[in-house]
């Protein structure tokens, strides 16, 4: 406990949530680099058809690699944010809110890119929507929680 504040959620965030988010983000980047991002479901089977997509839309491969790089950069931002939160740095909360914003922007930008380049969005649409809703909910939770503890971040 720092001051009169209980910091269980803070400790959960810095010791588990942000490390887990970093691992998930890096794991999510892998398909973009190895060409496993475009799939169709065919009678309970997922079939990746990147070769077909890339043949019809050559720029999509470049976009996929670019988004893989975005995910890696986002993972680095998460680690920096975790370190700043752990040290109660002055800019830590702004970085946390930025991370939550980026977690909405990257999937949204990827969805828009797919719709513009390919003309439609594959099976990941629901995952994108769920991740965006989760980010908004987390933003609200963190805003309330850290809003009450803003005075701790003075370093």
Q: What residues fall within each predicted segment?
A:
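Topology signature of small-to-medium multi-pass alpha-helical membrane proteins
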Residues: 1-155
């Amino acid at each position: 406990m720092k001051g009169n504040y209980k910091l269980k959620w803070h400790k959960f965030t810095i010791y588990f949530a942000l490390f887990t988010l970093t691992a998930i983000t890096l794991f999510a980047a892998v398909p973009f680099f190895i060409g496993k991002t475009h799939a169709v479901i065919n009678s309970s089977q997922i079939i990746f058809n990147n070769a077909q997509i890339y043949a019809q839309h050559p720029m999509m491969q470049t976009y996929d690699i670019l988004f893989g790089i975005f995910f890696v950069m986002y993972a680095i931002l998460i680690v920096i944010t975790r370190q700043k939160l752990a040290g109660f740095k002055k800019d830590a909360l702004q970085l946390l809110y930025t991370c939550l914003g980026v977690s909405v922007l990257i999937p949204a930008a990827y969805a828009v890119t797919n719709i513009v380049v390919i003309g439609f969005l594959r099976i990941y649409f629901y995952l994108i929507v769920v991740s965006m809703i989760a980010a908004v909910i987390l933003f609200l939770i963190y805003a309330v929680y850290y809003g009450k503890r803003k005075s701790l971040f003075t370093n």
